[in-house]
């Protein structure tokens, strides 16, 4: 019997390395885990592909999907809308595939309200100075935007207590190992093993 997949919520302030960690985790395209592809109204960045990185839609289309209750969660972030397809998530989990939601604390609260068993992971930078250095090093944003993101980061980081696990991304390889350890631990819980090893357990206990 295939165990139902786990839903992992991964959140972090911009620049903490969340997207890089998820990308490294899924680099070899494992069959038993995938990241959810969100809908968004923001413009594509260079190199982003529609349907692979995001489903890019306009505001009118996004609001229509809200009315249809199509989203597992949705939020407005930095003036843009982001949402996660309810149908896609449920279908993927029933196939025994772990799903990663790359969302902020607002979306995390919505998901937890609907699916309390979802596992929350919050990624923190080692310091504010390091976070600002990473944001500046991207070379993508103006100083005004960086200042805005730093201010927003303080608000976002105040929600770390709402998550089940906390990873400090000081050393990338260590943080990645921590994330993998969390995933492994969730696959070994009693509930997961009962589903995955049902036939074996029945044979072991057969009188």
Swiss-Prot record:
One of its GO terms (cellular component) is cytosol. Its main location: cytoplasm. SMART domains: GuKc. ATP binds at residues 12-19. Keywords: ATP-binding, Cytoplasm, Kinase, Nucleotide-binding, Transferase. Pfam families: Guanylate_kin. GO terms for molecular function: ATP binding; guanylate kinase activity. Belongs to the guanylate kinase family. This is Guanylate kinase.
